Structures are given as C-alpha cells and as structure tokens.
Amino acid sequence: METLDSMDKNKSVHKLKGIAPIYCINLDGQPERWEYMENQFKYWEIENYTRISAYDGREDDLSDIIKGTYPTMMSSGEIGCTTSHLKAMKEFLKTDAPYAIMMEDDCDLELVKFWNFTWADLVAHFPYDWDVVQMAIICTGDLHVLSLIHI
C-alpha cells in the first residue's frame, strides 16, 4: 500500500478526467519516444489515445499529400511534421468526437501536476466560438505542443 510520504502529492488523475481523445504523432524509428508517451498516459490514467505513425519528410513519398511543388521555406522535417498533423486530423475526422488533442511524442505532461484546475475547467473557459486552441511552451530547447481541434 502506498503511504502518504511515497505518494505524489501533486498527482490527481481527476485533473484530466474527461480529456479529449489524443492523437500522438511518432516516427516509426523512434520507439523510445513512444514509450515515453505511453508511460505518461499510464501515469495519468489516460486510455483514449492513438499513435499516429509520423511521415518522415526526409524519406517518405508525400506526393499523395502535397500536390505540386514542396514549400521552399520549410525543411523536410517541418514538411513531415505538418503532413503528420494532417494525417492525425484525418483520423480524428473519422470519429464523432467533438474535439481532439493533437500532440507530438516529445510532449511533457509534467506541468499538469501544478494545475489548480481540471481539464473540464479549462475547456469551460474556452471562448464559445473557438475552433482551435494551441497550448505550447516555446523555448530555445525542446518544443512541447498540445493543440485542440473543435469542429
């Protein structure tokens, strides 16, 4: 049995109760990053997630997705990332869910421990006419993104 001293005092699975379906983008060649995400989902008792096999802009043929000339201002990695997000959105649109979360395999849910609100509280404060909400911490190091799509 877990004692009070050994428990994570900031963890409350109730914070993420009712969280939207998650579509997590992960390159096939990076299983350690998928394991990292699965460990976080397990920790927070999140079960409604789907792994999206990411496109590799350096190697994959994306001609079925990108018509015409590839964008010249984007790196092959950015093209792969963008098309992977489109792939995740297509999967979401096959469902009846009112909205979903698109995230990449480097997303860190650690900050949830410090929320003084729940997922339901957060969604309740979105503008009534919202379409997309992007939650991100942008730093000079790793980028962690959580996007919400509402149709």
Feature annotation, model-predicted:
Residues M1-M103, C107-L148:
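An acidic/histidine-cluster motif and surrounding catalytic segment
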